[in-house]
Structures are given as C-alpha cells and as structure tokens.
Amino acid sequence: MAKEVDPCDHGEVVDAGCVRAVLAELVLTFVFVFTGVAATMAAGVPEVAGAAMPMAALAGVAIATALAAGVLVTAGFHVSGGHLNPAVTVALLARGHITAFRSALYVAAQLLASSLACILLRYLTGGMATPVHTLGSGIGPMQGLVMEIILTFSLLFVVYATILDPRSSVPGFGPLLTGLIVGANTIAGGNFSGASMNPARSFGPALATGVWTHHWIYWLGPLIGGPLAGLVYESLFLVKRTHEPLLDNSF
C-alpha cells in the first residue's frame, strides 16, 4: 500500500500515475458495485422494507461480493491500491498513507462509478427495483450504526494485517483474504444493517432510487470503523522496533 506521505502533495495534479490510479478506481468500483447490486437483484429484493433476505439468497450475494472484492482488489492493487471504498481511502488518509488530494479524487471516482453502475443496471434490467441498504426489522439507527462500525473495523483490520503489515506471511493473498472478510460480514450483518461497509456501495443505489432513509449510517459507520481499525492496528499490533515501513505500492 504506502508509506507515510505528505498529505498536501500538490505535485500529483500533473502526475500521470495519479491519473491512472483514479481511472483505475473508477473502473474497479464500477465493476464491484455492478456485480454486487446485480447479484442482490438476482437474489430477489424483499417486497417489505426491512424484511430479512432468506439465508440461501444472502449467501449467494455474499459469495458474489466476496469474489468481486478479492479479484478486483488484486487486479487494481499495483495501479491504485484497489480501494473500491471511501472507508479504505479515508482510513489510509487518516494514518498518512495517501495524500489528501489523491484521496479526494479516489472518493469522487468511487461515487461516480457507483452511480453509473446503478443507473445502468436500472436500464439493463428493465427498471427492476434497485436494492438500497436499509435497516432490518426491529433495528434502530444507533444499532445499525454500531453494526456498520464493527463490520468496517473488521474489514480494515484484515486489510492492515494481510496487506499493509510488512510482516505478513501471505502478502499476495491479502486481497483475496479481504474478499473473504467482506463475504463473511455480508452474511453476518446483511439482515441487520445491510452490511454495507462501503459508502460508495450505498450511495449509487440511493441516488438511482431517490431513497435516502438512514443513508447517513452508511457513511458515518464506515468512516468511523475504518480509521479506528488503522489506529488500533498501528498502535497495538505493528511492531515499532523492527523499523519496517508499511508496504509501499503507491497505495
């Protein structure tokens, strides 16, 4: 991913590598959201808001999401880092591993990609209902918020442990392991908070449908959980005496 960088490096404005990275985030996030939303549509959106999705259908969505995340992070790792997710970008910004300028471009690209993917899906499916992240029946806003914080925390913790930490024994498998935690969290939290873990993944469907109910949860939760995971991992689990910088792959 990246060593510490100057958060205000304006030289990236004319950096061809930065442009390629932003375009990669646009393409990768588009495919990720397209796959995830399409899989959810194929599984069947419950007619009653907040109704639980059958476990078999939820497992299918989790598998599709996990495979997409693992493959796409691997594909984009050496170009943009394969963030696909504003929570990842903001977590790395908070710990000084990406510039503020590049992170802003990444988030803009991720949101644009998600919006385009969902709008295109509405056209390709003949106007089928686009699934929007919502709270499960009986789940209140604070419960949903805490759920999203925990799920995103676990996601970023795995990213740090398997990709960022130079001591990782399986760095090449880090993106695939990241996909596995995304799938596991989807099953664990899908029927409670929706298991977004990704503001961009929630933004596109909300924009395409105009349904913004509790949308703030899918921003605030991941943007708390992600940076918190970075703080905890770097403070407690990254061995300082080794003097090893975080893996530098222009993340």
UniProtKB/Swiss-Prot annotation:
Membrane topology of the entry: Multi-pass membrane protein
Compartment(s) of residence: Vacuole membrane
CC per GO annotation: membrane; vacuolar membrane
Domain of life: Eukaryota
Molecular functions per Gene Ontology: water channel activity
SUPFAM superfamilies registered for this protein in UniProt: Aquaporin-like
Ranges spanned by the short sequence motif NPA 2, renumbered to the chain: 198-200
Subcellular location, principal: membrane
InterPro entries attached to this UniProt entry: Aquaporin-like, Aquaporin_transptr, MIP, MIP_CS
Chain location of the short sequence motif NPA 1 per the record: 85-87
Domain notes: Aquaporins contain two tandem repeats each containing three membrane-spanning domains and a pore-forming loop with the signature motif Asn-Pro-Ala (NPA).
Protein name: Probable aquaporin TIP4-1
